[in-house]
Amino acid sequence: MAGHSQFKNIMHRKGGQDAKRAQLFTKLAREITVSAKLGSPDPNANPRLRAAILAARAQSLPKDNIQRAIDKATSGGDAANLEELRYEGYGPGNVAVIVECLTDNRNRTASEVRTAFSKNGGTMGESGSVAFNFERVGLIHYPLKAGAADAVLDAGIEAGADDVQSSEDGHDITCRPDDLNAVSKALEAALGDPEFARLDWKPLVQVPVDADTVPALMKFLDILDDCDDVQRVAANYEIDDAIMEKLGA
């Protein structure tokens, strides 16, 4: 299993699912608000907002919540105080990690992320210290039911994508960041709405993680995901399927 950006945890903990879902809805709405604030409130004229709305719909965020998040961007208030931050460092097993945040309190967020690194076997670095391990890409994800692998590949090529990967988890289509809006629109015409379309961090080099390190790494990533200000976590780990099956048994 290769590491990737994630809104959901790889290893789900029992209990607290309602709280987790409420937290996810808050993060999705916050991304919509900031996207609308930085660009146009019209998703057809704002690729980032359009991607944020698609991601929210895929997670069943109610339509009224989506509209309120857009309205918040144009009415000022709390939205004016939100800023984007990015932190980088290494987690257990020397895995490179990028943490993307939206916050109204830079000091609070920095403290939470720094604590997550320092107390869980990680080391936080300077900006750019691990980004060279990743490539910035546009990522469009479809479920398996969207079509057979060959059909999705053909649609991806026709849409101008750079790569199409199909697995039991679905279809991942990547493109240049500047092409995300055009490629996603072309794919929608052929395959329908994706589960999400967003800018992502694609690992250029993957770090194998042994069985002894996996639990610590998963705990660390889980703690980062649980931070209210963290929007997305990218990590360049690779875990053998046999190890994952053993740990999940």
From Swiss-Prot:
| Keyword match Cytoplasm | yes
Q: Which GO terms describe its cellular component?
A: cytosol
* Any one Gene Ontology BP term: regulation of DNA-templated transcription
Q: Which residues form a coiled coil?
A: none
Q: Where is it located?
A: Cytoplasm
Q: Which GO-annotated molecular functions does the record name?
A: DNA binding
Task: Tell whether Signal is among the UniProt keywords.
Answer: no
Write one Pfam family the protein is assigned to.
Transcrip_reg
State the source organism's domain of life.
Bacteria
Primary location group: cytoplasm
Q: Which Gene3D superfamilies match?
A: 1.10.10.200, 3.30.70.980
Which keywords appear in this protein's UniProt record, sorted alphabetically? Answer: Cytoplasm, DNA-binding, Transcription, Transcription regulation
Q: Which HAMAP family match?
A: Transcrip_reg_TACO1
Describe the family membership recorded for this protein in Swiss-Prot or TrEMBL. Belongs to the TACO1 family.
**Protein name, entry field:** Probable transcriptional regulatory protein Rru_A1086
Q: What is the species listed in this Swiss-Prot or TrEMBL entry?
A: Rhodospirillum rubrum (strain ATCC 11170 / ATH 1.1.1 / DSM 467 / LMG 4362 / NCIMB 8255 / S1)
User: Mind giving the lineage of the organism this protein is from?
Assistant: Bacteria, Pseudomonadati, Pseudomonadota, Alphaproteobacteria, Rhodospirillales
